[in-house]
Swiss-Prot record:
Gene name, Swiss-Prot/TrEMBL: proS1
NCBIfam families named among the record's database cross-references: PRK09194.1, proS_fam_II
Keyword match Nucleotide-binding: yes
Residues spanning the signal sequence: none
Entry note about domains: Consists of three domains: the N-terminal catalytic domain, the editing domain and the C-terminal anticodon-binding domain.
Cited CDD domains: ProRS-INS, ProRS_anticodon_short, ProRS_core_prok
Keyword Cytoplasm: yes
Chief place of localization: cytoplasm
InterPro entries the UniProt entry points to: aa-tRNA-synt_IIb, aa-tRNA-synth_II, aa-tRNA-synth_II/BPL/LPL, Anticodon-bd, Anticodon-bd_dom_sf, Pro-tRNA-ligase_IIa, Pro-tRNA-synth_IIa_bac-type, Pro-tRNA-Synthase_IIa_type1
Record keywords, A-Z: Aminoacyl-tRNA synthetase, ATP-binding, Cytoplasm, Ligase, Nucleotide-binding, Protein biosynthesis
Quaternary assembly: Homodimer.
Source organism phylogeny: Bacteria, Bacillati, Bacillota, Bacilli, Bacillales
Protein name as catalogued: Proline--tRNA ligase 1
Organism: Bacillus thuringiensis subsp. konkukian (strain 97-27)
Amino acid sequence: MKQSMVFSPTLREVPADAEIKSHQLLLRAGFMRQNASGIYSFLPFGLKVLHKVERIVREEMERAGAVELLMPAMQAAELWQESGRWYSYGSELMRMKDRNAREFALGATHEEVITDLVRDEVKSYKKLPLTLYQIQTKFRDEQRPRFGLLRGREFLMKDAYSFHATQESLDEVYDRLYKAYSNIFARCGLNFRAVIADSGAMGGKDTHEFMVLSDVGEDTIAYSDTSDYAANIEMAPVVATYTKSDEAEKELEKVATPDQKAIEEVSAFLNIEADKCIKSMVFKVDEKLVVVLVRGDHEVNDVKVKNVYGASVVELASHEEIKELLNCEVGSLGPIGVNGDIEIIADHAVASIVNGCSGANEEGFHYVNVNPERDFKVSQYTDLRFIQEGDQSPDGNGTILFARGIEVGHVFKLGTRYSEAMNATFLDENGKTQPLIMGCYGIGVSRTVAAIAEQFNDENGLVWPKAVAPFHVHVIPVNMKSDAQREMGENIYNSLQEQGYEVLLDDRAERAGVKFADADLFGLPVRVTVGKKADEGIVEVKVRATGESEEVKVEELQTYIANILK
């Protein structure tokens, strides 16, 4: 492709609203442009990268036995109502009405549509297992779109769905697609980890996220320093043991703590270590109010609270609900004197506290010398806190460290969550009606492009891995007015294309500095500069990733490039 014919508008300045490198560079290099908040156009170079990621995805999905189809972006509300997600999915689901006032949603995901499709066509175990996938635009009304392609309102996604007669069949396909995902991200050149995850609004169990390691990631990964254990911080269980001290219990005492609300403030004011304080929080669990206790130096993990109750929705109670329940403000909450109808659950660590402190459910007061079970009753002690760095790894090997990650893929064992809700059944080999067992597997295709750009860049621009680069080679005649340079550049361009390489020829009448700056910004793997030594049959070859350059004779160029790109 000749650069003079390409629509690739570059920017010299970093856009003010672009916070992270991938967003900045994809805009500056002319790979995309923003149309509205969280909505982008892919320009020609960006589209080439997107298509290469798509191709890798398709190859690995088909190798894993999945078959491609395409479903509609507009989905009837009746399907979402049938599954129970029309209201529970929340405000991220974009809803609309047609001219006849019939309700629809723009597809945020396609479990309902695929389940409806398959239930009408697959009636026997003889047609199972079945794995179908699509690459389709998705829509989510993000409250705060940010980070370019990483959190947008419209994005390209590959979603696959598998249907099974037995759990063993699901396990087999899940493992196969887990490996396919690992192959996809490895072929894209990414540094990633597969981690144990929460299924969230999707439902089901046994789920893994594929996380690209990056400081700008919105998720925290907890991983072992000596084993391959890795989990989303929301899902990492705490296996710590707590020993109760033999300190004698003291008499409960209420003390004034004016204007002291946060644990750190109360701890300092009372000269008590944070690990002897009891942090009390009120959660709304499927409309039921529950008091949750953790140690003062720990944080409540709301996903674990949700899992304790098998709840659909868990959220912090409002100030008004807390005021009505306990007649106090958030900073004074405590478990002592709570109405017996209100359930109190606590993290394991709370049971080991002796002579601790807690809120007194009275503004400006706390209790000291608080002892669980003597001063208040707990209905259940369980794992309710976030794991911390330095904790023992849940697999028993090593200690936990944290890293940030960008989620690019997610695989779920949905089980019968959707098939039972939507009456998607089949006849088993005994002629009995059974619900279809399902799996779900998603990859953020456009998000993967951003993740690659986030991992592969330097101070001068993008540095694309060869598997996804828009072109393999960038040929730059320095002076297009020179017949020797222009002709040699065109000859190299043509010969490399004949060898199967994708080549970009900078045939613009621009200054050398502009051409080189754009070349660095685009980040193609190999740059061939045709300069003053063209008359001698010599060019300069530069490897973008390493910055290494060498003069090469034209007759040796193809072999030299082949060795770089092998």
